[in-house]
Amino acid sequence: MAALLCLWLVAALAQADEGAGFQPLPVDDPVNGGTMPGFVFYPLVEPSRIVWRGPYEVHATPGARVTDGSKPLVVVSHGHGGSALGHHDLAVSLAHHGFIVATIEHPLDNFHDLSGTGTAKVLVGRPIQVKATIDALLADAHWNAKIDPGRIGVVGFSAGGYTALMVAGAVPRFSRFLDYCELQPHDAEICSALAKAKLRGSEGTELAALQADLRKWGNPADSRVKAAFVMAPLSLLFDKAGLSSIHAPLFLSYAENDDVLVPKYNALSVAPFLKTLTGINRIPKAGHYVFLSPCSPQLAASAPAICTDPPEVDRVSVHERINADALTFFNQALRIPGQVQDH
């Protein structure tokens, strides 16, 4: 017993001394041209520093050298109007445990540019951009030597959850916008653009054009992705048939009081049809934005809508659970049996 306790203490101390590094990750955008900004997080053998990137307090050391060995890769897709650092605590947590994590900023659908909302460049382009990020890392000699191409996963929140489902093989049916907006016409987040199209008498034509564009930039699905961790997804566009082609294990997390993407029409509507679903977590009393990293005082002051939770919801504690769920899920879904793992 004493020997086992000693080994546990050594392992715990070793883990405490490990840190995370990160550096910019520019990726060519195959949808719009130009470059997508992003970051890559990775494990270090020394403790992390705390640095500021805009309003984000990131617990990772910029530019530090990644540890040796082949590691699993996870790509993170942010929500509508989000940021490449919107889930930095999850990226750091996974990096602490031996993962390489890439976070990208989706063009035309981020905090400083929403001009692509509702267009094919966003609704079809998002999964293509995730695939391009994987391509870029595997084509880079430095990162290729650090990544195990057989252990790749994806994380997505909100519109990023929609993105992750598509990368995992789901096929949306855009006419479901009409069905949903007939039931919930006052949902400004989802239905405002459709209402404008309806006034022009063109909503059916526009949705049909979106459907026709599903493979405009290639197949949105990526067979290299072996696991998808999905948070509060925009999933009302998927029916049973569209979900039947998902090839990867899934974990689904949603907020009980989400009034942006109501669970009844999104997370809970798809859960019964996810044949590869391995786990589901309901966050009691929380709203949609609880999945974003806990906010710094600066971010809370400038963006209270995405930083404010009900009094009974502690976002820091919620994220301890989210990060633990993600780690457990990816460890089970991506680890190759019998292979010696880093960390």
Language model: regions and residue ranges:
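Cap/lid segment of the alpha/beta-hydrolase catalytic domain
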Residues: 81, 85-88, 92, 105-128, ...
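Short substrate-entry loop that stabilizes the transition state in hydrolases
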Residues: 48, 59-71, 76-113, 259-263
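Short beta-strand/loop motif that positions the catalytic acidic residue
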Residues: 246, 252-254
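Acidic catalytic loop of the alpha/beta-hydrolase fold
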Residues: 236-237, 257-261, 288-289
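Domain-level recognition of soluble alpha/beta enzyme cores
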Residues: 15-76, 96, 279
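Gly/Ala-rich beta-loop-alpha elbow adjacent to hydrolase catalytic centers
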Residues: 156-160, 164
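Short alpha-helix in the alpha/beta-hydrolase fold that links the catalytic acid
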Residues: 248, 262-272, 295
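Alpha/beta-hydrolase active-site loop
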Residues: 119-145, 166, 175-199, 214, ...
